[in-house]
C-alpha cells in the first residue's frame, strides 16, 4: 500500500493564500530573545525556501539557530521579524486557534524522543492526533500510514514491544496520518544506533522519492545529511553555506571543516547568500 495521499486543506477564512511551488518559505526571519546584556539573536535575517517534494537537512554547531529555525518554520515559535509561509498560508496572519489547526492538519512532526503513549498500540498512537482533534480516522488510513513505514504487521504492538527504530517509524507514521504539507524532523536519529538510523533515514528519503513528501530535518550528523537533496549550514543565526547535488557525508564534513577554519570567509559567503540588504 502507498502512503496516504495529501489532502487539499482550505486556508483559514481571511488569511492570505499565495500559490507557490515551495511548500515552506521563510523571509527575513529574525528571532531575538532577552534584553540588555542577556539579549541573544538566534536568527539573523534568514531567507530561504523548501521546495515541494524535497528533502533538506539543516546543520550547524550548537547555538547556530538551527532548532530555532525549525521551530519558527513549523509555527511552534514566533519570529521577532519576518514571515513564514506554509503551503500558501502566511502563519503571521493566523490567530492562535487557526495556527493550532494548521499545525495539526498540515504539519507533521518527528522528534528525537519518540513521544509514544506507552499504554497504546502502534495503531492507536498513529491515530491519536486525529482523535485528540475529535476526528475518527478511517482504519484504512491508519493501516496505510503504518504500511508506508513498513510496520503494518506491528499495528497491535505497544512501544515496549518495539525496537527503538520501530518506535521512531511509528512516530513517522503518526506524522503522516494528517497527510501533511511538510514533515519537520528534529534530530530524528539522535537516540538510535547506526542500523536503526539508516532505517529511519531511508524511510524519510523514500517518502520524498516515492510520495512527493516535503521533509525538513535538523541534524548534527553528516551521514544523516547525506540523505538529503540539499544541506543548509547555519552559524550565528545565518545561513552561511549550502550544498546541493551529489551530497556525501564526506563532502558535508569537509565543508563544515572549511567553514570552521575560515569563519570570516563564511560570513562573507553568508552575506552573498542573503543577497543585498533592503
PLM region descriptions:
Residues 35-40, 91-108, 132, 249-253:
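ABC ATPase NBD coupling module
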Residues 59-61:
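The feature captures the beta-strand-to-loop junction immediately N-terminal to the Walker
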Residues 82-93:
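Conserved ABC transporter NBD signature motif
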Residues 120-128:
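Short coil-to-helix segment of the ABC ATPase nucleotide-binding domain corresponding to the Q-loop/switch region
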Residues 158-168:
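Conserved ABC ATPase signature
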Residues 179:
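Conserved catalytic motifs of ABC-family nucleotide-binding domains
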Residues 183-186:
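Catalytic Walker B motif of ABC-type/P-loop ATPase nucleotide-binding domains
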Amino acid at each position: 500500500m502507498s502512503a496516504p495521499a495529501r489532502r487539499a486543506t482550505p486556508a483559514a477564512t481571511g488569511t492570505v493564500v499565495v500559490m507557490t511551488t515551495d511548500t515552506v518559505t521563510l523571509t527575513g526571519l529574525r528571532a531575538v530573545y532577552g534584553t540588555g546584556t542577556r539579549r541573544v539573536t538566534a536568527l539573523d535575517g534568514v531567507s530561504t525556501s523548501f521546495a515541494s517534494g524535497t528533502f533538506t537537512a539543516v546543520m550547524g554547531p550548537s547555538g547556530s539557530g538551527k532548532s530555532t529555525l525549525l521551530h519558527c518554520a513549523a509555527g511552534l515559535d514566533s519570529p521577532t521579524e519576518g514571515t513564514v509561509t506554509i503551503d500558501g498560508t502566511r502563519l503571521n496572519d493566523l490567530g492562535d486557534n487557526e495556527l493550532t489547526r494548521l499545525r495539526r492538519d498540515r504539519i507533521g512532526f518527528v522528534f528525537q524522543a519518540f513521544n509514544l503513549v506507552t499504554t497504546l498500540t502502534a495503531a492507536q498512537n498513529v491515530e491519536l492526533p486525529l482523535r485528540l482533534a475529535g476526528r475518527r480516522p478511517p482504519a484504512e488510513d491508519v493501516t496505510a500510514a503504518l504500511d508506508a513505514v513498513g510496520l503494518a504487521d506491528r499495528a497491535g504492538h505497544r512501544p515496549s514491544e518495539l525496537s527503538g527504530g520501530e518506535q521512531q517509524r511509528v512516530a513517522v507514521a503518526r506524522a503522516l496520518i494528517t497527510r501533511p504539507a511538510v514533515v519537520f524532523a528534529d534530530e530524528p536519529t539522535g537516540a538510535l544506533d547506526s542500523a536503526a538510523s539508516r532505517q529511519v533515514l531511508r524511510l524519510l528519503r523514500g517518502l520524498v522519492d516515492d510520495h512527493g513528501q516535503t521533509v525538513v530535518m535538523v541534524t548534527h550528523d553528516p551521514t544523516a545529511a547525506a540523505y538529503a537533496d540539499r544541506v543548509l549550514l547555519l552559524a550565528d543565526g545565518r545561513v552561511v553555506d549550502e550544498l546541493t547535488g551529489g551530497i556525501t557525508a564526506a563532502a558535508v564534513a569537509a565543508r563544515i571543516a572549511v567553514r570552521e577554519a575560515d569563519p570570516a570567509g563564511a560570513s562573507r559567503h553568508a552575506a552573498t547568500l542573503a543577497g543585498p540588504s533592503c
